């Protein structure tokens, strides 16, 4: 069997995997980052890394889980960089210019802004649960913690969001 014959199924497998998972991964990254451009960059980097290692990753029980983990890790890196840049810009007395116009229903951007304002693990747990529809066990695998810890993150995040959303209703009503 030639090299081309052995790699062709792997390439076709990656292409199908990419087409099937790309949108879902972008939604997850967007939930974590709040920017469509940044989300697409992170997801493209994750899929590029997966493509380079596809002969190995294709044999994993959960290739999607591998890509998801890379997306979450890279999104976390972007957020750390943004925080450092934000601090530097504010030390200089300048205004930041990080605004994007996402295609969301009215009010959704504000809700996700509040999610991103949560502690990092809580925001990640919320995004993985509500955007990527993962179980507590799966989220624990992505975040490297137990399902019980995931439950705690989700509970605390929901409490904070409930308080914030209740204050919105009081202000509006």
Model-predicted regions and their roles:
Residues 2-27, 37, 51:
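A short, charge-rich alpha-helical start-of-domain segment used by transcription regulators
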């Amino acid at each position: 069997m030639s090299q081309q014959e052995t790699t062709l199924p792997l390439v076709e497998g990656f292409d199908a995997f990419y087409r099937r998972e790309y949108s879902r991964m972008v939604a997850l990254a967007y939930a974590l980052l709040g920017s469509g451009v940044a989300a697409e960059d992170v997801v493209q980097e994750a899929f590029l890394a997966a493509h380079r290692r596809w002969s190995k990753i294709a044999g994993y029980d959960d290739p999607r889980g591998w890509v998801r983990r890379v997306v979450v890790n890279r999104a976390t890196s972007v957020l750390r960089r943004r925080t450092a840049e934000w601090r530097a810009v504010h030390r200089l007395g300048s205004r930041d210019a990080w605004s994007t116009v996402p295609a969301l229903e009215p009010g959704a951007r504000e809700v996700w802004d509040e999610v991103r304002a949560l502690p990092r693990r809580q925001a990640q747990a919320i995004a993985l649960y509500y955007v990527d529809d993962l179980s507590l066990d799966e989220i624990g695998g992505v975040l490297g913690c137990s399902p019980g810890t995931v439950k705690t993150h989700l509970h605390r995040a929901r409490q904070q969001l409930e308080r914030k959303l209740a204050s919105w209703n009081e202000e509006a009503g």
